[in-house]
């Protein structure tokens, strides 16, 4: 999916808006968008950002001792 930066957007803000998190996805988005890091922390308005599909981490099952 392709999205475009809004005024004052940072890459992590875009990742949170689309993926709901930044952990493990910012690096993937940077890899899919060569040259994006050179634009600076605040992306110019209208910058196209390709958002690749990201694998979700498996949810670890927890056990409560007092159930």
Curated annotation (Swiss-Prot):
Gene Ontology CC: virus tail, baseplate
Domain of life: Viruses
Up-regulation conditions: Expressed in the late phase of the viral replicative cycle.
Keywords, comma-separated and alphabetical: Late protein, Viral baseplate protein, Viral tail protein, Virion
Subcellular location, record wording: Virion
Principal subcellular localisation of the protein: virion
Keyword field contains Electron transport: no
Signal peptide range: none
Protein name: Baseplate protein X
Organism lineage: Viruses, Duplodnaviria, Heunggongvirae, Uroviricota, Caudoviricetes
Name of the encoding gene: X
């Amino acid at each position: 999916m392709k999205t475009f930066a809004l005024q004052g957007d940072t890459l992590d803000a875009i990742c949170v808006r689309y993926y709901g998190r930044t952990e493990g996805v910012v690096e993937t988005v940077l890899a899919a968008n060569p040259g994006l890091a050179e634009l600076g922390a605040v992306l110019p308005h209208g910058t196209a950002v390709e958002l690749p599909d990201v694998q979700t981490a498996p949810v670890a099952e927890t056990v409560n001792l007092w159930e």
